[in-house]
Curated annotation (Swiss-Prot):
Residue positions where N6-acetyllysine is found in the record: K266, K776
Domain notes from UniProt: The PHD-type zinc finger mediates binding to histone H3 methyllysine at position 4 (H3K4me3).
Binding annotation for Zn(2+) 2: C883, C886, C909, C912
Name of this protein: Transcription initiation factor TFIID subunit 3
Disulfide bond annotation, renumbered to this chain: none
GO cellular component: male germ cell nucleus; nuclear membrane; nucleoplasm; nucleus; transcription factor TFIID complex
Residue ranges, annotated region (Disordered): 131-152, 176-197, 221-358, 405-578, 603-658, 692-748, 778-807
Gene from which the chain derives: TAF3
Amino acid sequence: MCESYSRSLLRVSVAQICQALGWDSVQLSACHLLTDVLQRYLQQLGRGCHRYSELYGRTDPILDDVGEAFQLMGVSLHELEDYIHNIEPVTFPHQIPSFPVSKNNVLQFPQPGSKDAEERKEYIPDYLPPIVSSQEEEEEEQVPTDGGTSAEAMQVPLEEDDELEEEEIINDENFLGKRPLDSPEAEELPAMKRPRLLSTKGDTLDVVLLEAREPLSSINTQKIPPMLSPVHVQDSTDLAPPSPEPPMLAPVAKSQMPTAKPLETKSFTPKTKTKTSSPGQKTKSPKTAQSPAMVGSPIRSPKTVSKEKKSPGRSKSPKSPKSPKVTTHIPQTPVRPETPNRTPSATLSEKISKETIQVKQIQTPPDAGKLNSENQPKKAVVADKTIEASIDAVIARACAEREPDPFEFSSGSESEGDIFTSPKRISGPECTTPKASTSANNFTKSGSTPLPLSGGTSSSDNSWTMDASIDEVVRKAKLGTPSNMPPNFPYISSPSVSPPTPEPLHKVYEEKTKLPSSVEVKKKLKKELKTKMKKKEKQRDREREKDKNKDKSKEKDKVKEKEKDKETGRETKYPWKEFLKEEEADPYKFKIKEFEDVDPKVKLKDGLVRKEKEKHKDKKKDREKGKKDKDKREKEKVKDKGREDKMKAPAPPLVLPPKELALPLFSPATASRVPAMLPSLLPVLPEKLFEEKEKVKEKEKKKDKKEKKKKKEKEKEKKEKEREKEKREREKREKEKEKHKHEKIKVEPVALAPSPVIPRLTLRVGAGQDKIVISKVVPAPEAKPAPSQNRPKTPPPAPAPAPGPMLVSPAPVPLPLLAQAAAGPALLPSPGPAASGASAKAPVRSVVTETVSTYVIRDEWGNQIWICPGCNKPDDGSPMIGCDDCDDWYHWPCVGIMTAPPEEMQWFCPKCANKKKDKKHKKRKHRAH
């Protein structure tokens, strides 16, 4: 329904737009297409808006998101603004109701005006729904043991945790109930006492059991009435799972925490669900936490873990005012499925550090506390086994959870400076390093804005740190990598991982303070983790130092190499020329020797000083020698032009590895340039630059040059041969023309005297050969050749057209004659040049019968028209003479005839005259029209 309705509205809007643009009507198909385009466009725009809003942590787009979406689609906001100002807006014809109809909210969030709305903490963003009161949340948590994922359950734990945390901090009695988390210990016990408790508890698991830690769900239960029994605590842990992740973690958390949890539940039993249980609890939780710390965060010593957790200020630790806020979020995190796992990890972390334990207690449900109270003796003995089992479970869960969490790996292990990215960094060397502290601060800031996954950012952070630490410890134990990453792991476990980052700041500071105390902890896992972390840190430091040293050494080497190259270039400049004369094959040998002699080691301080002095001297020498060697260089340049070109190409790529650089840079041709090039090249060129490989390359280059030269020479020779052939052909043609002229002179002495164009007549003969080409070129419309074998003996005589036309016909045959013809006025006919090209290709005298048809055309009325091969003009009535052999008719002036020859005498055209000197022909045909 919605789609069809929206499409109908879009169709109306398309019609309105078309109407506004001046269209009176639109075809239905065009309207459908435009509607489809508009629909897709709006969908793309809306999709971009939502993606940008989600990218910036909002659920609904704002104008900024719309602007970003427009820019993404290539729409300029300034142009759009101008468009809106210049075009009148068209209002929709009728009012559009909001659709689809909104449905009732099933999430059961409290109304904004309810009592909980006033208790919204500063760190809770406004876009998050109101939080249920702590009592209501406790009731809800009791009911959902399965770890429901309702947003309500998620949110309720946050505020309840904060309230409970404050209560626990005030009352130590609550410590035995549900508030066995380490936040109370962290606040109440001084930093020194915590490490002691941790170390003592680390030694004895029983102490840890005493302060059983509540799973993350137990933190949620804190908001539930403090009177929750241990069983109730378990339920609350189940409730904490209401968030999707907690249910998976809950089983592991219960298995890991059962021994430690009974104590915690006892302390929690009163309203002490908050982590502010008595310091005794904290001490207990640290003990239990130590084993989990071993499992979950082997890298961190129990103390470090507690410090990290405290530092994050997960709101459960009374020490930091931020901790209460964090606790509020922590209850929400218990809702996440991972919270149960976090609970065991929380117990472990409590052993490690009281603050960490407090945070984790919130995460662990009262169940853990009950289990701890019941199983205190068992947990001391079984703590290690349970830890291992919990580790396995945590690992499995972490694997399952990590898949959805894009932040885990990216945020965690790989960048030391980024605490957000990986818990490993925080847990490991980074906790001690200022980077970790900075990252922790960043996390606290991010925590202030709760992530969508976690009801409260800090609470989710705590829960994440618990589960993440356990998962990380297990993973590290398997991989042998430090487990300090666990505190940041919450990010890995769920999308809310990023918000928990605020905790790391406190954790980093606390870890720094507690790290020495963690040394006291004797457990092997912790020690191994610490040693691993230290080793890693040392290795990183060493690598950094090495990198720095390498950079420094590289810079020094570059400077040295530059100086060396300059010196060697100057020293070897002239020797090169000598060597090249003697050994042109290996022009670089001298250079190689020079570089080998000058080693960076030898060229240290003394070398640098000497080099500078030598450079100045070399410069002077170069200037003096430069003048003398200009002549030599010019000669070499002429010889080595190819080399220089190649050398120039390698010189610019100074970036290439020195080994790859080609020696050609130092070729004799470029020897003069070498001093200028050396300073830039030296840093790039290593001592090994001049090796056999380079020699081979040089040889290959030389070969290539030689081959290229040979090819060029061959091409030149070919060209020269062709030119010579052309010249020969031209000479032959000229000779033939001269022969024709002589023959004509003998046959017709009259022609020579009247017109000086007789030599051109011979050219005409050549032109007459290719009648086809000439016919095409004939400028006169009648000049088109028509096949006809009949020819009147005397075409109608016409006034002599002047000797010019005669020149044109001969000109086509030889190129030089063409030039002469051009000088004369007879160049008018364009056929001349075309004929010349054709004549050059074809034999000079080749066609007898073809010529007949070529120069005879039939007009529209069927009359035959003869074309003069000499001038390529049709019969114009002027006197013409016909060749007794080829039947071509020439104007008298074109052939140099002034008076009619006797009829008994045969007359041959210039073409035939040469062919038939000694032959007798039929009667001469001569007619004057």
